[in-house]
Amino acid sequence: MEHQYMTQTPMQSPMYYYTPQKQQQIHYNSHMAPQNMDYFSQPISSHVLYSQRSSPVFQQQPQYISQAMLTPAASPRPQHQKPTIMLQQEMPSMNMSFDSDCYGPATPTLSATSFNSADSPNYHMMPTPANELHMNPFDGLKQNCEDDMFGEWTQSTSPPLTPAEVYLHPASAFTENSSYLLSTSACPSLSPSPSPSVCDPRTLTVPSNAFPCLPTLCAGDDEEHKLILKGDFTPSKTFDASELMPANHGFPTFEPLFELDVEDEFSASKRQRVDSQFTADSSFCFTDASFSDEDLTFSPCQSEFSFTSGPVVDMTPVRRSASKRAPKVAQYSAAAHSSANQPQQLPSNAAAASSSASSDDHSHSHPSTSSTTRRGRKQSLTEDPSKTFVCTLCSRRFRRQEHLKRHYRSLHTHDKPFECTDCGKKFSRSDNLSQHQRTHGAGTVVMGVMTSDMTSQMAVNVPDVGSGVLRPKSESPDASELGAMLFDHAAAVAGSSSGSQSGYDSAEDNSFQQKKRKRDE
């Protein structure tokens, strides 16, 4: 049963009666006193809101309503007190489906003809559709424009593909006003006016005579950049925009900025100064010889190798021996006379060699001393007064006499009084002999290839302890005897470091001497 609400007026005092039906056997009639209703009902609009065309009007259909919440009313309710509440389920702005064909406003072309959309006699709507009444596709316009779709679009006289103005009318409007909407060239415009002249973007470039000459942006000489930056422009250094137009479609291109692509100054070689008088000849060349240990011997106060103030300094690398021998020759005469008054004790062979060398010291001393090469620790070049022993041949000073004797034997006389007991090699200095004897190695063991029958019988040959050669023995000793042999062998090796005789044969000695580095005789 459809339920109905009652709208009450403000000044009405309703009366409620319960009238029992005749079918029921009730023997009393109940009567309720009237009650004043102080509340007012909400006014409800009686007209229907806008809705979708095909959508029905829904009414509220309550399924269950409690009788205690209902206001009792008289059974014969008047007709004017029966309004119906209508609820709209859909909003009018959301009734458009996603698959509907919507058309927005057309994009106008670059046309020189200016006309208003209100000039059309049948124009009565906004360009942008606001509802779905006129959302029908324009089949007639599409068929007429499809013929010129594949035209030559590169020509400036071709019509634009986007119409300048589209009237949102039904399809019947195009059949009635077909002569008004479309012209002979399929460009929508007014019928009495000619086709609109479309502006070609390629003709929008400004000619070169419209503006004065601009400065060039290309890389050039430094003098040209100075003139350009100062404002002294020459017509020969400018560019014409008309020359660049065919290759670049009317848009001029710019060359790189100042000196950004110059390859001369960014090459792998060292950059040279070209704008000053400083040449490469007057600059100092730092080579590997400039950072040698020769510079460490110079003291800032007593250095004899002070740089000259000549115009050009010769930077050729000088041999270390020649640079050390050069100042010594100039001081030879003074040092030779001063060393004669000092007491010296020389051997007989050293005195004879020095007397024979002093007879022609002024004539042949320079080539002989320059050719010799000094070995060992480098001596200081400063003249120390504490060094009282001076060599008469090369004016070298020493603090001890044995150092001076060693100097004569190693450099001047080439006397070799020290001989190796192992190989018989002679040396002029005792320290060289002791260093040589370490190479023999008194405790070295000569290893040989053993056969399979030797592996079972191994022992150390006791008489040949000096040579230390491992040889097989007839019977193998026990553990205690083998330990005693090893202990005695180690003690013998430690005691015979320099006094042991060589146990090598001649072939081993010759092969060892070939490996040694020989001194220049």
From Swiss-Prot:
Ranges of Low complexity composition bias in the record: 347-358, 494-505
PROSITE patterns, per the entry: ZINC_FINGER_C2H2_1, ZINC_FINGER_C2H2_2
Compositionally biased intervals (Polar residues): 336-346
Region annotation (Disordered) ranges: 312-383, 494-521
Induction and repression of expression: Expression is induced by the HOG1 pathway.
Annotated knockout phenotype: Strongly affects the production and secretion of liamocins.
Gene Ontology molecular function terms on file: DNA-binding transcription factor activity, RNA polymerase II-specific; RNA polymerase II cis-regulatory region sequence-specific DNA binding; zinc ion binding
Zinc finger C2H2-type: from-to: 389-412, 418-440
Post-translational modification: Phosphorylation by PKA leads to cytoplasmic localization.
UniProt keyword list: Cytoplasm, Metal-binding, Nucleus, Repeat, Transcription, Transcription regulation, Zinc, Zinc-finger
Record Pfam families: zf-C2H2
Entry's Gene Ontology cellular component terms: chromatin; cytoplasm; nucleus
Compartments in which it is found: Nucleus; Cytoplasm
Role this protein plays: Transcription factor that controls expression of the genes involved in the biosynthesis of liamocins, glycolipids (also called heavy oils) composed of a single mannitol or arabitol headgroup linked to either three, four or even six 3,5-dihydroxydecanoic ester tail-groups. Targeted genes include the liamocins biosynthetic cluster genes PKS1, EST1 and GAL1, as well as related genes such as the ABC-type transporter encoding gene MDR1.
Protein name: C2H2 finger domain transcription factor MSN2
Species of provenance: Aureobasidium melanogenum (Aureobasidium pullulans var. melanogenum)
Underlying gene: MSN2
